[in-house]
A protein has these predicted regions:
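A solvent-exposed interaction/effector surface
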Residues: 1-150
């Protein structure tokens, strides 16, 4: 059920350090752990932890799924592996729950909520996940699924 969990918001542009990976989304936590250790000096109270998944795991073989993970940084960061994520109008699904339920949240957003609205997917921008809290022991997260719309 997504009623009350989805709002339309203006998302800012984010400069982010990122790493690109191929593989099952189920093993993404390993890549995250390495990234967080490697870039720990760039993490501050204002850091956003951002994920971009490019493939639907029901359509793409797990080993071929593509994703970027990263963290927001200031303008002063000049590392080679930085990019600018374009913000703009997004449908933001505030998700709180077990990581295994994230896929169902995506399905609800795209198959139930979006078709019933006047909005359309803005395919010129990335769908991003912004993590607020992660409880590794319980496998629970609080995150925003940000779907660019027009």
């Amino acid at each position: 059920d997504c009623n009350g969990k989805i709002t339309i918001k203006q998302i800012p542009d984010y400069r982010m350090i990122y790493e690109r990976h191929f593989g099952s989304y189920e093993h993404m936590h390993r890549a995250w752990n390495k990234l967080l250790v490697h870039y720990r000096d760039y993490i501050s109270r204002d850091t956003k932890f951002i994920e971009i998944t490019y493939d639907d795991p029901s359509l793409t073989e797990a080993k071929n799924c593509l994703y970027d993970i990263g963290l927001s940084v200031g303008e002063e960061c000049r590392l080679e592996n930085t990019t600018i994520l374009l913000g703009g109008k997004c449908a933001v699904y505030s998700f709180k729950g077990h990581i295994k339920s994230i896929y169902a949240a995506y399905q609800t957003l795209f198959l139930v909520w979006l078709p019933k609205t006047q909005y359309r997917l803005d395919e010129g921008r990335n769908i991003i996940d912004i993590y607020h809290t992660v409880d590794c022991a319980a496998m629970e997260v609080e995150m925003d699924i940000c779907v660019p719309v027009k």
